[in-house]
């Protein structure tokens, strides 16, 4: 991807405002220095995993949780409707728009944003509890959330997962058979925007082989623990 294209894609950032000014930003965390200080003094690591939709990030996250007993997944709050099989408090904390807005006003999120037509946010309290128990917390979030958290906490490791190439990514999305043509085009546009922010991450890994990629990411986490402690 050329530098010119990256600049164009960066202008296509898909953050949208919540009632005029409620977008993902560091403001949600910086207003509560005590909460941020707890993060800075916590015993665990924050591991952030980001990638475009269709790159295999969710599958990698599930596999990491299976092979590493010290990892816990950060559970996001969302305004979207539950999908078949999803359980409250396990997959997501499901909120109405008004409930989500109230949590934002109370500075209850480490980060939050609108993605597609729904809001997603990371509750502070649950993450703080895990970190202070000495557990490492795995975040499955986008570049905006990664940027916000990295600015407001220490012991943060950010990993971006790339597809082998754009053509493979598009084919994976089509193979899902869950989106129409318009949705696929939107996902591809957002994917290229995501990829343009990969250079902001500590590590960039290409998922061209699942098992090999899993080993690479786990090795990064283990090395980060050794460095931190």
UniProtKB/Swiss-Prot annotation:
- Record EC number: 2.7.4.8
**Which reaction equations make up its catalytic activity?**
GMP + ATP = GDP + ADP
Return the Pfam families for the record.
Guanylate_kin
EC category name: transferase
Location(s) in or outside the cell: Cytoplasm
Residues at which ATP binds: 51-58
Checking HAMAP family in the record gives: Guanylate_kinase
Q: What is this protein called?
A: Guanylate kinase
- The protein's gene is named gmk
């Amino acid at each position: 991807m050329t530098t010119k294209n990256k600049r164009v894609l960066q202008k296509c950032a898909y953050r949208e405002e919540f009632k005029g000014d409620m977008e993902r930003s560091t403001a949600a965390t910086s207003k509560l220095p005590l909460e941020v200080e707890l993060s800075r003094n916590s015993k665990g690591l924050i591991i952030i995993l980001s990638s475009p939709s269709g790159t295999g990030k969710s599958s990698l996250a599930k596999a990491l949780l299976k092979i590493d007993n010290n990892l816990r997944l950060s559970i996001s709050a969302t305004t979207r409707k539950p999908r078949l099989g999803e359980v409250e408090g396990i997959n997501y904390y499901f909120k109405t728009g008004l409930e989500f807005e109230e949590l934002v006003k109370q500075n209850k999120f480490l980060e939050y944003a609108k993605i597609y037509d729904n809001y997603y946010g990371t509750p502070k309290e649950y993450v703080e509890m895990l970190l202070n128990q000495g557990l490492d917390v795995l975040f499955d979030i986008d570049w905006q959330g990664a940027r916000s958290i990295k600015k407001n906490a220490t012991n943060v490791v950010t990993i971006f997962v790339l597809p082998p190439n754009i053509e493979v990514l598009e084919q994976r999305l089509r193979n899902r058979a869950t989106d129409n043509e318009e949705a696929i085009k939107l996902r591809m546009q957002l994917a290229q925007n995501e990829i343009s922010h990969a250079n902001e991450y500590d590590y960039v890994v290409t998922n061209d082989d699942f098992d090999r990629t899993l080993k690479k990411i786990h090795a990064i986490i283990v090395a980060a623990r050794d460095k931190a402690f």
